[in-house]
A protein has these predicted regions:
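C-terminal catalytic lobe of FAD-dependent flavoproteins
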Residues: 253, 285-425
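Flavin (FAD/FMN) cofactor-binding and adjacent substrate-gating region
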Residues: 74-77, 83, 97-174, 178-186, ...
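Glycine/proline-enriched, intrinsically flexible loops and inter-domain linkers
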Residues: 387-801
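Flavin-dependent oxidoreductases
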Residues: 23, 57, 179-294, 300-314, ...
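Dinucleotide-binding Rossmann-like beta1-alpha1 core, especially the glycine-rich loop
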Residues: 53-130, 253-258, 263-265, 286, ...
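Beta1/beta-strand and adjacent pyrophosphate-binding region of the FAD-binding site
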Residues: 3-20, 37
């Protein structure tokens, strides 16, 4: 099957011939690329693929659901074409022990329906008709997905490798990848145990070895993954046999799944709440078709849950326990896409134990990215550029992976529970003071920030645990209401230091020409002005939503969303002039950012600064002294659209400035304010945010931001696409919904990612939601087809308009 000699040059080199690498090779061949080399250090499928639990389930949120659906359709097609991949479309039965879990399943079923997946809601009494072994007394219901199934991962590996080779791809087994070689910021070759291969594109699909390859490369790059132990057991035969049509049983409240294995056995697996990391220092060079020594004590709870859920099988004994390393990421999202440090180096790693579930979708999506040169917008949660250096830290990964494994069983929510492990990494100077004021903190890009403040008697919680997210009225609503009232009627202060901050400058005015090309708004403004702008791609979609502040004739200060620190820094760097005339400097940690919001904000700041702020107009800034602190940037802008200011304080002055504001603010009714309050304020004002309303597929015209686009400029990236869209009309538009016939005190809320239906047809998706205290109702922003009429949001048990 494999070639004996390495070619000297190749268009695409794929490192790793597991189910992921083979899928990418197959899909590239299908797109007409045939100069492909696949390298495998052992034999095809010898890593994680051979011991996969075969699961392919589609009741997943966001990108996971899209990938799983693509995989199911792909496996169906392969099987129907006569390829024996062991595809068994037995369906899955997802069961719920609580009303919260049931509501989560119903939300996921609504999302799946929008993707074309049939889902059948089950009452407790009907569950046994689907799965005769399941105990239902403690269940509140479930969802049956008929098109879910099982796939033989080794058969899939071999089939895809065979088809890829028939299309022209070359395979070499027994070839170790030693390092990736790059030049001028782009991949140029790969060094292997059999020699060097020059290449235009390289895909790293090497599982738990990926970090080792990255460390050895010249220069190195980050692949934040870590291996943890994962186990499943296989029972002895059930004497009476098992029905052929038995679906996979998924009891995530019990952290357990099971399915028919062969004619008469069960495979029983699970996801421990606290997993055990492995290979914490070095990954073995060879781990071909191998297992770890089983940890029966760790696995015991999983099998106990199986016996509890299927009591008629409690006397069925275990035949064996398979324990092996699986690769996980620090945020439980897979890594797929171009590395942040090296152009044309693509990562396809960290599938969090779901290689078989995602392989078909991953191959399709990454091959499209490589061939077309740009990713699809739905891949944003898996973008490697969502990380910063700390995420690749050894100790951080060792601690975080223990928590990541169990996250697969949590009900998904737009406001996920905060991580307990590896916290307090990036901290504002104000964090200790805010925690003294009972701040409940969350983490974004490793940065601690206050979510809200528990005034009164704070609730005791272990570590940095936050309340379990609710699909209805959250526990913290009264706290946020108090903060919201302060911002609307008096003055509130919020620490927003996590924003990504950059200086762009040049010796002359080259930076002006550069930003005029990158920004869709006109940034050639007088010194002292603030310009809110998008940075668009060639298709007119957002690559960045930011403000640029002209501080000098040849220097700008750019503020971008927290999650964009690596992504937009890299994107701007890729566009810098080759002559070095424009420089980019990341100054995120240089400034502590304070929002001062509310109708009394001006009075407070005038007293604190001793300045007359009547001349500080909206969208302008001044550098001024505040008490003993100098060089404080006071911006007449904030992204909630409330009256107020943004203070960019040199971090060494942060404590002094904050204390002076709080002391002076007593007479103004000042209150500390957290992120959730700002979120509610901006949603109520119909302000779109990056990664919720805005991404690389959404244009300013669709987001109602045409006023921030200056088509009369001679040129900017994306101009022609926006001109064409303005002429032809919009295919979708951001809209603002107020929910009717809805009791926000007792009913589920629209939080984001709920599908929108019109006359039973899917027409859009909510992007973010919250409570508008002023309007007195639940509101949400929606990306929808631009038509009018009655629409339904399935919030269960109701559909609301």
């Amino acid at each position: 099957m494999q070639e004996a000699v390495l070619p000297k040059v190749c268009r695409v080199v794929i490192c790793g011939a597991g189910v992921i690498g083979n899928s990418i090779a197959y899909h590239l061949v299908r797109r007409g690329w045939t100069d492909i080399l696949v390298l495998e250090k052992g034999r095809i499928g010898c890593g994680a693929s051979w011991r996969s639990s075969h699961l392919v389930g589609q009741l997943c949120p966001s990108v996971e659901g899209i990938m799983a659906r693509a995989s199911v359709l792909f496996y169906q097609q392969l099987q129907e074409s006569g390829h024996s991949i062991g595809w068994n479309q037995c369906g899955s039965l997802y069961v719920a022990r609580s009303s919260r879990r049931m509501l989560s399943l119903l939300r996921l079923a609504a999302e799946a329906k929008a993707r074309g997946v049939e889902c059948v809601v089950q009452q407790p009494k009907t569950l046994t008709s689907r799965h005769p072994y399941v105990r239902v007394e403690d269940l509140v219901g479930g969802v049956f997905v008929p098109s879910d199934g099982l796939v033989d991962s080794m058969a899939l590996c071999r089939t895809l490798a065979m088809l890829a080779q028939e299309g022209g791809a070359k395979y070499v087994e027994g070839c170790w990848v030693q390092r990736v070689v790059s030049e001028n910021g782009a991949v140029c070759a790969v060094d292997t145990s059999l020699g060097r291969v020059e290449c235009e594109n390289l895909v790293l699909a090497t599982g738990m070895w990926s970090r080792e390859v990255a460390r050895s490369s010249v220069p190195g790059f980050a692949v934040p993954v870590h291996a943890a132990r994962q186990s499943y057991g296989i029972t002895r035969p059930v004497p009476e046999g098992i029905p052929d049509s038995l679906p996979v049983l998924r009891d995530y409240d019990g952290r357990m799944y099971c399915h028919r294995e062969g004619a008469s056995r069960f495979l029983v697996g699970g996801f421990e709440e606290t997993a055990k990391p492995v290979f914490t220092h070095d990954v073995p060079e060879k781990f071909e078709f191998l297992q770890l020594v089983p940890d029966y004590e760790q696995y015991k709870s999983t099998y106990g849950q199986f016996q509890q859920r299927c009591p008629s099988l409690e006397n069925v004994q275990l035949a064996e326990v398979v324990t092996a390393p699986e690769t996980f990421t620090p945020d439980a999202q897979s890594i797929l896409g171009e590395a942040s440090e090296v152009e044309r180096l693509y990562l396809a790693v960290g599938m969090n134990g779901a290689q078989s579930q995602f392989a078909g979708g991953v191959g399709r999506a990454l091959s499209r990215w490589i061939v077309c040169g740009a990713p699809q917008a739905f891949l944003l949660p898996w973008d490697p550029r969502r990380f910063i250096d700390l995420h690749n830290n050894d100790q951080f990964l060792r601690e975080r992976v223990q928590e990541v494994v169990g996250r697969r069983c949590l009900p998904p929510h737009p406001l996920q529970p905060e991580w307990r492990t590896a916290r307090s990494l990036r901290c504002s100077p104000l964090l200790p003071l805010l925690e003294q004021q009972a701040a409940v903190t969350g983490e974004r890009m490793g940065f601690e920030r206050a979510l809200y403040f528990e005034r009164g008697t704070p609730v005791e919680r272990p570590g940095r645990a936050t309340p379990e997210p609710s699909y209805g009225r959250p526990d913290w609503l009264d706290n946020v209401r108090e903060e919201y009232t302060a911002c609307r009627e008096r003055v509130g202060i919020s620490d927003m230091s996590s924003f990504s901050k950059f200086y762009l400058e040049s010796g002359s005015t080259a930076v002006v020409e550069f930003l005029q090309k990158l920004c869709s708004n006109d940034v050639d403004v007088p010194v002292g002005c603030i310009v809110p702008t998008g940075m668009q791609n060639d298709r007119g979609g957002y690559e960045n939503d930011c403000i640029v502040v002209r501080t000098h004739h040849n220097r700008y200060f750019m503020v971008s969303p927290t999650a964009q620190q690596t992504r937009i820094g890299r994107w701007v760097q890729q566009h810098l002039p080759g002559d070095g005339s424009v420089s980019l400097r990341d100054v995120t940690s240089l400034y502590t950012v304070l929002y001062v919001l509310g109708p009394k904000s001006r009075g407070l700041l005038e007293e604190a600064t001793g300045s007359d702020l009547r001349h500080l107009q909206p969208y302008t800034y001044q550098e001024m002294d505040l008490a003993y602190a100098s060089n404080v940037l006071v911006l007449g802008y904030n992204n909630t659209l409330e009256p107020g200011y943004s203070l960019y304080v040199p971090s060494e002055f942060a404590l002094h400035v904050y204390n002076r504001l709080m002391k002076t603010g007593r007479d103004y009714g000042v209150l500390d304010v957290g992120y959730y309050t700002l979120r509610f304020l901006r949603i109520e004002k119909f302000v779109p945010f990056w990664a919720e309303e805005l991404d690389s597929s959404v244009t300013p015209l669709e987001a109602n931001r045409s006023a921030r686009v200056k088509l009369q400029k001679e040129y900017f990236v994306g101009k022609f696409a926006l001109q064409e869209q303005a002429e032809k009309g919009l295919r979708r538009q951001l809209a603002f919904f107020q929910l009717r016939e809805h009791d926000w005190d007792t009913d589920p809320w629209a939080w984001g990612q709920e599908p929108i239906f019109r006359d039973g047809q899917f027409v859009g998706t909510t992007t973010s939601g919250g409570l508008a205290f002023t309007l007195g109702c639940n509101v949400c922003q929606v990306s929808e087809q631009p038509n009018w009429g009655e629409k339904e949001v399935p919030l269960f048990p109701h559909r609301v308009l």
